[in-house]
Amino acid sequence: MTQQRSQPTQRTLAVATLLASLLPSIDVPARTNDPTIDFNRDIRTTLADKCYQCHGPDANQRKAKLRLDTEEGAFRNEDGVRPFVAGKPSESEAYRRITTDDPDDLMPPPDSELSLTDTEKELIRRWIEQGAKWQ
């Protein structure tokens, strides 16, 4: 009788051990696992979803003559103001605008009904700190 009770317990333990050994192989999104921020994987989609409507390829819709869909536009220096400054989030106007509490400066503007999540803001900050490599 003891043997019958221990068999299910041993099987349960074996299954639990097997499942526990598989946990590290579960694919967690690269955004949280990879300390290196990849522009195409982590940044481009956020810019496309939240910024390109007003700062993208459509010249008729573009605001402030700013393009964030091209490397040239994203790093241009317009009167000492640059959207992204590699290695320097505090000098990056785009980062300042997405993190400000001032509704007059906030991007995307509140009336657009778009906003960046804290995770998206953090990824952009880390990307800038890591050199803002454009791909």
Functional labels for PLM-detected ranges:
Residues 2, 26-135:
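Aromatic- and Gly/Pro-enriched helix-to-coil junctions and flexible linker segments
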Residues 2-15:
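Bacterial N-terminal signal peptides that target proteins for export
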